[in-house]
């Protein structure tokens, strides 16, 4: 009785182990191809990985994941020749491309050809016999370049030999290898978009291809390093001529503007002095931006919004979508327990919670008594998303003297479940948002080591707790505070009202709608940090918000929202991408990252 059951178990084990082995091989292939061809974007230009079952003559048979080729024709005359092309052409972004073919059996006569061909070349021929077809043949060692007449090139090859084919897309040449040794240049002036190709002609011929599935016999990586050095030397020796002084001055200005953009205050000042330049933004302004960036990157969004409103009074009023984005991020930081409003609720909610001016206050919130340690005079209406009622000329304070008690696990479970979500999430969320990114990834996370804010204030008692804690051993919603959770839910209602107001005033925006829904979705999970939307709680998500706010502030000073250095890097990257699309192989060895030290 146990026989059939035991047999099924054995078969299942074989299948599972076979799948695991295939997955491991695929992983190794991907790693090797990424190492060999780092400049290739396979989403745009896939690499050849096997022979194509759709692009071959009928006398060709494929097996072993379309890597083994065998001949199944009559093999009586040259008209019985048959070839097969790879699945994709060789991308120019490879710079140097290489594949190998092992002769498993030479068959009856060993009439085998290994090489390249363009799309559309006749597959009823050996590679090299027709226009835009190139091959090295095993029976006579001749090379065939778009002609039925071969030229003496190398030794013959037979069973057990490994023949490699290397295409140099920089100088458009091709050379072959035999058992790991180069045979020299075979073809020059090659056209672009060639496919690896192999052809057979007599019964019994069998060959295996290696497109990177296994380590190559020939040391192609050493050859690639040689060409990388050549290309980088050409870049280093690029002539500047008589404009060297002008070139140097331009680079210095780009570096200076980059330091100013990211608020590297002391460094920017020292660099400007050493290069005899003027800083085109007041030192106080740089330090103000530095302070705001630090607050955003540490998750203290409420204080960041408040400080922005104090230092740049009309900025957020003129940019309601920016304000909305900041407040959505503040809600996320509330869930995370990092925003100051939920970390320390002993004092008044910061003015950061003040609203989009002129909008109706739709929800009442509990008012917290302010302490007298610090006050700011402001000129804004604060009507919703603020936690307290306020008016023009209101004096606000935000020193937080005590932190609220924690909530028990069962209570947290209820608020993290569906009931908590229904309190906030509305099916009528309709709004818009600006894109987070500037087009160039910029991080200001190191921009706070130099200088200090001229608008700096005394630290609140809970400030030490507001810094990002990446080693939290017990993560709880809003830090586990019942009062904080209630405030977070209230803030969510107010944020919903703000979105509806924006929709009425500015029309629908699917991006804004998605942003708010994603943020509210965090409450659908008992452990939002390990949920499908938990990526929002990662501190790295603060960086695009910080960059967008920083750019908006710079624009108020008529300064570029992106530093010229970042734009130049982006342009260089786009040029390399264009070179790849137009067949210039040198782009493979000219990575922008190689020059960022």
Swiss-Prot record:
Instruction: List, alphabetically, the CDD domains matched.
Output: SPRY_RanBP9_10
Q: Which GO terms describe its biological process?
A: cytoskeleton organization; retina development in camera-type eye
| Composition-biased stretches (Polar residues) | 438-456
Q: Name one GO cellular component term.
A: cytoplasm
Disulphide bond pairs: none
What residue spans carry the region label Disordered? 343-375, 389-417, 437-475
- Name the InterPro entries on file: B30.2/SPRY, B30.2/SPRY_sf, ConA-like_dom_sf, CRA_dom, CTLH/CRA, CTLH_C, LisH, SPRY_dom
Q: Where in the cell is it found?
A: Cytoplasm; Cell membrane; Nucleus
Q: Where is the B30.2/SPRY domain?
A: 29-216
The record's section on PROSITE patterns has: B302_SPRY, CTLH, LISH
| Any Pfam family | SPRY
Instruction: Give the protein's biological function.
Output: May act as scaffolding protein, and as adapter protein to couple membrane receptors to intracellular signaling pathways. Acts as a mediator of cell spreading and actin cytoskeleton rearrangement. Core component of the CTLH E3 ubiquitin-protein ligase complex that mediates ubiquitination and subsequent proteasomal degradation of target proteins.
- How would you summarize the oligomeric state and partners of this protein? Identified in the CTLH complex that contains at least MAEA, RMND5A (or alternatively its paralog RMND5B), GID8, WDR26, and RANBP9 and/or RANBP10.
**Official protein name in the record:** Ran-binding protein 9
Q: Which species is this UniProt entry from?
A: Danio rerio (Zebrafish)
- Gene, per the UniProt record: ranbp9
């Amino acid at each position: 009785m146990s026989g059939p059951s035991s047999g099924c178990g054995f078969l299942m084990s074989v299948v599972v182990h076979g799948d695991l082995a295939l997955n491991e091989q695929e992983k190794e292939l991907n790693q090797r191809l990424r190492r060999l061809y780092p400049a290739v974007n396979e989403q745009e230009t896939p690499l050849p990985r096997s022979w194509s079952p759709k692009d071959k003559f009928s006398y060709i048979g494929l097996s072993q994941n379309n890597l083994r080729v065998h001949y199944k024709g009559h093999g009586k005359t040259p008209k019985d020749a048959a070839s097969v092309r790879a699945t994709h052409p060789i991308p120019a972004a490879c710079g140097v491309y290489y594949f190998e073919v092992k002769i498993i059996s030479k068959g009856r006569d060993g009439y085998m050809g290994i090489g390249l061909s363009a799309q559309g070349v006749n597959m009823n021929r050996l590679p090299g016999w027709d226009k835009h077809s190139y091959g090295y043949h095993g029976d006579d060692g001749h090379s065939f370049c778009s002609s039925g007449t071969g030229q003496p090139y190398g030794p013959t090859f037979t069973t057990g030999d490994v023949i490699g084919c290397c295409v140099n897309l920089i100088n458009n040449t091709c050379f072959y290898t035999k058992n790991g040794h180069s045979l020299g240049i075979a073809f020059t002036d090659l056209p672009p978009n060639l496919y690896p190709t192999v052809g057979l002609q007599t019964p019994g011929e069998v060959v295996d291809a290696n497109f990177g599935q296994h380590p190559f016999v020939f040391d192609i990586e050493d050859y690639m390093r040689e060409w990388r050095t050549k290309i980088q030397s050409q870049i280093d020796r690029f002539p500047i001529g008589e404009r060297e002084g002008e070139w140097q001055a331009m680079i210095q200005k780009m570096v200076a503007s980059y330091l100013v953009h990211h608020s590297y205050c002391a460094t920017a000042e020292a660099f400007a002095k050493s290069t005899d330049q003027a800083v085109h933004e007041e030192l106080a302004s740089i330090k103000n931006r530095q302070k705001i960036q630090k607050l955003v990157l540490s998750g203290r969004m409420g204080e960041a919004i408040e400080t922005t409103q104090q230092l740049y009074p009309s900025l957020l009023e003129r940019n309601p979508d920016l304000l909305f984005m900041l407040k959505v991020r503040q809600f996320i930081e509330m869930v995370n327990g990092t925003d100051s409003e939920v970390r320390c609720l002993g004092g008044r909610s910061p003015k950061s919670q003040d609203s989009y001016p002129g909008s109706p206050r739709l929800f009442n919130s509990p008012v917290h008594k302010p302490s007298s340690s610090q006050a700011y005079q402001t000129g804004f209406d604060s009507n919703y998303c603020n936690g307290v009622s306020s008016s023009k000329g209101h004096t606000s304070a935000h020193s937080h003297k005590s932190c609220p008690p924690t909530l028990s696990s069962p209570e947290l479970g209820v608020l993290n479940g569906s009931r908590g979500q229904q309190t906030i999430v509305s099916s009528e969320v309709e709004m818009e948002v600006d894109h987070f990114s500037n087009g160039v990834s910029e991080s200001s996370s190191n921009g706070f080591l130099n200088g200090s804010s001229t608008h700096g204030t005394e630290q609140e008692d809970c400030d030490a707790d507001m810094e990002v804690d990446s080693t939290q051993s017990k993560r709880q919603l809003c830090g586990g505070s019942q009062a904080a959770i209630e405030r977070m839910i209230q803030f969510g209602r107010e944020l919903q009202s703000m979105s509806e107001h924006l929709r009425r005033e500015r029309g629908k925006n699917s991006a804004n709608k998605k942003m708010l829904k994603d943020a509210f979705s965090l409450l659908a999970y008992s452990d939002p940090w390990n949920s499908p939307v938990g990526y929002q709680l990662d501190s790295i998500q603060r960086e695009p918000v910080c960059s967008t706010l920083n750019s908006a502030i710079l624009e108020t000073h008529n300064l570029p929202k992106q530093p010229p250095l970042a734009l130049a890097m982006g342009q260089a990257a786009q040029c390399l991408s264009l070179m790849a699309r137009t067949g210039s192989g040198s782009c493979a060895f000219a990575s922008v990252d190689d020059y960022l030290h």
